[in-house]
């Protein structure tokens, strides 16, 4: 027996009853970004594998274990993007968008791909909204990005459900000094580390700080801290960021173990976390990556950004019960037509009403059917009103207008008077 066709594991369909919440989130954020002066950029899903190997870093879990990579017909190694920053930096470089110190404030949205174990809030195809800023080196833009996300949580009604965690990773030189000290400390305790942390000792030892294994976290209690190795410039940058967040009353927690999962971060690192989604508690994360553009062959260019997971945010909206009820509003009007002349008139009237009443949700019966069956479909649609057109109505240029959600009587309304009458009824309903 042939296997029935199904979606690939971890790659989910977003069904019609789910998409209103997605559109609400995306629309709310797009409006907020527009108000802050950010411009949308649309990026390819496929990139050369080298882009991510160089940008994210060899030895990271993303590059070593999670990327969807294949050879095309020309033997080129291509990868389905696992994150958006590297592709955005590539586009900025390729098109000269940051040349001459030009400030760029960009945002994007779309699917990302990682071969992970699918679970609630974690998928192999997942969606992100990302923001990237180039050529602004100070803590003021770091603060703007964090405040921007804070405003989004307020608009969505979830501000009390998320907490900002903040850290500074210092300069690359400071991290190198700290890495050496951390490795020396852990080397003496190597056999006590979990297997994953042992592997990271040679690839990305700072990621051990983020281990979820309790025994490893216990070993880290006496470990040296990154803040003891910070350079003065990074300390001043971090203090400037905190001062700006304090000025607007934005509360945060300092988490010295917050290192982010990608190698390109420096100085500011932040995450918004929640305790409402179980293990998948990070809903937004980002930070500064001042060396990434030059790592890709460009001139030294300050960069900072963040990404948020759409699936997790929608799940949090659902968990908190803050999705506006009107997102799933039913149709305003259902048009029933009996006979070909009535069907033609229904089509004409429907288009006139759509022009006269912007935003109206209007359904015209399709597939003919008896009076009884059309009325049944009108009721099932959830529409508030029904229009009825038959031979007599067409001959007299009137419609039957019937409320479906209360006990109101059916009325006969002239075609010319219909837009005004319907608009008044919708305003009262």
Curated annotation (Swiss-Prot):
Keywords: Aminoacyl-tRNA synthetase, ATP-binding, Cytoplasm, Ligase, Nucleotide-binding, Protein biosynthesis. It catalyses: tRNA(His) + L-histidine + ATP = L-histidyl-tRNA(His) + AMP + diphosphate + H(+). This is Histidine--tRNA ligase. CDD domains: HisRS-like_core, HisRS_anticodon. GO terms for biological process: histidyl-tRNA aminoacylation. InterPro entries: aa-tRNA-synth_II, aa-tRNA-synth_II/BPL/LPL, Anticodon-bd, Anticodon-bd_dom_sf, His-tRNA-ligase, HisRS-like_core, HisRS/HisZ, HisRS_anticodon. It comes from Pseudomonas aeruginosa (strain LESB58). It is found in: Cytoplasm. Its main location: cytoplasm.
């Amino acid at each position: 027996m042939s296997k029935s066709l199904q979606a690939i594991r971890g790659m989910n369909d977003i069904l019609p009853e789910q998409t209103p919440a997605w559109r609400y989130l995306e629309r709310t954020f797009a409006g907020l970004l527009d108000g802050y002066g950010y411009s949308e950029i649309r990026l390819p899903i496929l990139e050369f594998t080298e882009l991510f190997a160089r940008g994210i870093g060899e030895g990271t879990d993303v590059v070593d274990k999670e990327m969807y990579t294949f050879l095309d017909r020309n033997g080129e190694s291509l990868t389905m993007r696992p994150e958006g920053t590297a592709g955005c930096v590539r586009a900025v470089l390729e098109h000269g968008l940051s040349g001459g110190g030009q400030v760029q404030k960009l945002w994007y949205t779309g699917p990302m791909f990682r071969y992970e174990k699918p679970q609630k809030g974690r998928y192999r195809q997942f969606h992100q909204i990302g923001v990237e800023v180039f050529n602004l080196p100070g803590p003021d833009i770091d603060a703007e990005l964090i405040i921007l996300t804070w405003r989004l949580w307020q608009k969505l009604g979830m501000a009390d459900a998320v907490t900002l965690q903040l850290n500074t990773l210092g300069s690359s030189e400071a991290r190198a000094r700290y890495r050496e000290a951390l490795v020396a400390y852990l080397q003496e305790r190597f056999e006590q580390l979990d297997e994953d942390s042992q592997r990271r000792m040679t690839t990305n030892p700072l990621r051990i700080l983020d281990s979820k294994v309790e025994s490893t976290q216990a070993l880290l209690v006496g470990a040296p801290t990154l803040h003891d190795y910070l350079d003065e410039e990074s300390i001043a940058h971090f203090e400037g960021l905190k001062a700006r967040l304090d000025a607007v009353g934005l509360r945060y927690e300092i988490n010295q173990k917050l290192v982010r999962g990608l190698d390109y971060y420096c100085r500011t690192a932040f995450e918004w976390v929640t305790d409402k989604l179980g293990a998948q508690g990070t809903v937004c994360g980002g930070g500064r990556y001042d060396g990434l553009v030059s790592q890709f062959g460009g001139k030294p260019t300050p960069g900072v950004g963040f990404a948020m997971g759409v699936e997790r945010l929608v799940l949090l909206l659902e968990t908190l019960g803050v999705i506006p009820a009107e997102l799933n509003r039913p149709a305003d009007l259902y048009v029933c037509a009996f006979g070909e002349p009535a069907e033609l008139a229904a089509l004409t009237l429907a288009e006139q009403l759509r022009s006269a009443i912007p935003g109206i949700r209007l359904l015209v019966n399709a597939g003919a059917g008896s009076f009884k069956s059309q009325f049944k479909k009108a009721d099932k649609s959830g529409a508030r009103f029904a229009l009825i057109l038959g031979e007599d109505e067409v001959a007299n240029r009137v419609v039957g207008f019937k409320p479906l959600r209360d006990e109101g009587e059916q009325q006969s309304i002239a075609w010319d008077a219909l837009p005004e009458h319907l608009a008044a009824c919708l305003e009262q309903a």
